[in-house]
Amino acid sequence: MGRPRELEIQARLFRGDFGFEWTTHCGERLRILHFGEWNREAGPDFKNARIEFEKHGIEEGDIEVDWDARDWETHGHAVNPSFANTRLHFYVNAAGAASFARSSDHRHIPQARLFVECPPPPAGKCSSQAVSLEAARTMVDRAAKFRLETKGAAFSSASRLHGANAALFFGIAAGLGYKNNSIPFLLSAQRTGWKAAQGNDVEALLFGIAGFLEPRSFDEADDITKTYLKPLWDSWWKVRDSFSRCVLPRSIWKFSGLRPPNHPHRRIGALASVARNFPKLQKQIGESKEKGFLRFFEELDHPYWTGHWNLSADPLAKPVALVGADRATDLLLNAYLPMLGPEDAAKILRAARGPQASGILERATVWLLGCESREFLRTAWDQQGLLQLYRDFGEASSSEALEKIGGV
């Protein structure tokens, strides 16, 4: 896996994945009180952020995110008046020489480094260096507990920055994108914004920002699809100029290798339906907790998307569930459980049956035990632990991983 796109870094930063406290390269501590909003115009990535500096107190202004510390100068931000209100410059790669950021009016702009993981793909050493079943059980339990705590901390951070409802909505968006399109879905939700997601135009905004409202899609559509798209186009046309910078590039989406029900068009339709029915989701969670969450997705429908795979496909012979049982369970694990306390979440996770095992889970099992086995593929708890182990230690053998985490 190469270095992540800047868009991915920005989305994860906005969600709170990297925390909210940093130290500038001049040694001053700072705390992000609010990341503000995605910038729709020329200038920094985020507008109207609130930042509390150790020495200067609370400041309101803009935030720019770049890969390299020197990008502030090389990209011309220093002489661009659109960046004059920037209060903080984040970067990932530290320059060899000392860097300095200034605004067009010669004001010093603090810089802080983001530490972003760029893990290589697991090599999957296994077989001859596998561990015993007893050791594997301990490793999986520790990893599942760590994964649950990490996701809980991430939700707490997102909730602190954006509110619990927005954090849940963003989590559902990322989950609907699954592993192939998690970041584009998160970006679509973030750039739409939680406030707008509660409005009547949410579907038009989501499709427009995703880049899926193209003239060709409408011109080549059948009558049913044109009837569906016309009100979306009418709404998007009025605001698309103001959102032009927020529209995602087509290159960020992955369309190949997906099952038809998982096509991004259909998933964005599902996300719009979640947004429109969010009060119902809250009500069902309040009444039945995790069962209410799962029932919400079991009942979720859409007048167009339960009968279509994508905007160019023929209508389906019969309606198909908007969100299947396995995806609903995945959303439960990754969007709902992090909201709960660790003990309650662990209890549900241990009792829940895991989704159908993916290829990576099967490879992780061979990596851990040296052979194919269903031992750790039954419960959601075991699957989560197995995924975490393979993600963190897949380049080593499982016996080497056991040594790294302290043995049994």
Please give the residue ranges for each predicted region.
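Short, mixed-charge, low-aromatic patches
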Residues: 4-6, 125-129, 292-295
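Hydrophobic, aromatic-lined core segments that form the binding pocket/scaffold
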Residues: 141-385, 395-398
